[in-house]
Amino acid sequence: VNTMRQQGNIWGSYAKDRDGWLTDEIREYIKDKSEYAYFPGCTASFVEQDVAQSTALILKEAGVEYSYIGKDEQCCGIPMLVSGRWEVFDETAAKNIESMKKLSANTIITTCPACWLVWEIYYRHWAEERGIDYPFHAKHYADVLAELIEEGKFKLTGDIGRKVTYHDPCHMGRAGVRYEGPRTLIEAIPGSNFREMRFNKQEAHCCGAVLTLVADPDVAEIIGAKRIQEAIDTGADTLITACPCCRVQLKRSRDLQGLPIEIRDLSTLVAESLGYNIPESNAVIDEKWGVFEQMIRLMTPWGMADLMADMIPELINAMPDMYRSMMNMVIKAPDVFKEPMISMMTNVMPSLFPKLMPDIMPKV
């Protein structure tokens, strides 16, 4: 919550670095005001910058002019919404809507399906409930490009020489009922050799990202591995998705399980077909998610227990003399006496420790 309020994202990154994904070519193309505005979202801005860059360059190649909020962009707020911190979501919605109005845009193009869902549905409801003017509609980049392809205004020519299958993100599919845009875009890529998984569209299995991954990484690994195996069963060599968070989860599950398939975001394959050679963000994904996962595991009861176990010598040394002597006596006592002594302390420590911790922790 503090990171959201202070830095506008949940990845622990600095707000000043939000536009760090911009290349000179993209920066020069961005308009001050435009009918379209690009909203990369947190994961594409801070973690999967190859996705943000690919999307921005694809839109440029398709002739779509767009503006961009830049450093003032905030997280869409959906993590706060689903975790019940509605007051933080309120603050975020107000900031983003105000910033977007300054760009004079009426169509917001997103990289992330969750951001699309928020801009198209949740922000609209939020604004209507408060009597605030809301002149926006949102589209995922895949839908924008699919429309241009169907109108004959955008064509891909570079053969990528792959066998691909597609994972439907839950926010885009089940929640948003957006299935055809990504498929139109995939099939327009020469050499994509697209094949569907057995469970697709409204029947597509979740990859295990978002709430599952945050709540229980071990369960998420199993869910992700099952989804990846479905992709492998199609004979595909590349599993693509149109959601940065799905990519993080699928890549993590693949790496942990050692499964033989490449994980890519759709935007990066389109950019590849257009001749762009954009460096992949896999190392950053590993680094950022590694820190995130350590914090998730630390906040579990067993994680805190392991941490406290490692810190016991330092905690004891930082205690007032009386308690330090008592704890050392317990530690040095023969086993036959140790268990009864610990049992006696069990009723005392839950009330005693909160009083001791403010003095102990600064010393530790």
Language model region names:
Residues 35, 101-106, 164, 231-237:
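Short, surface-exposed connector motifs at secondary-structure boundaries
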Residues 218-237:
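A short, acidic, amphipathic alpha-helical segment used as a generic capping/interface helix at domain edges
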Residues 39-45, 71-84, 109-121, 167-176, ...:
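Local cysteine-cluster metal-coordination motifs and their immediate loop/turn environment
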Residues 1-127, 133, 148, 287-353, ...:
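Iron-sulfur-cluster electron-transfer modules
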Residues 87-94, 154-168, 213-223, 280-301:
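A polyampholytic, Gly/Pro-enriched intrinsically disordered region
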Residues 150-154, 164-218, 306:
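Redox- and metal-dependent alpha/beta enzyme cores, enriched for Fe-S-associated oxidoreductases
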Residues 130-158, 199-202, 255-293:
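Short, flexible loop segments at boundaries between secondary-structure elements
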